């Protein structure tokens, strides 16, 4: 299976998906707009997909790997989890909360 996310010319997530996002993409000072995820090559017979976005670079800052996002119940027929799926309500999946 292969996943792809949009990266800028430096190989980083674009600012709109991180701490430099614009005010309309923030809640309580934190970015809330999830990046799109392209999915391909899902194994035949898969019944469901799950994802986790774990930030291991946070260990020196807070002492543990920060889990930014966890979700399950994604259809194996999904080719694209759209931008802002975490908040738009337009994409069917179950999300974890922290």
Regions found by a protein language model. Give the residues of each.
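N-terminus-centered regions that define maturation/targeting leaders and the start
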Residues: 1-98
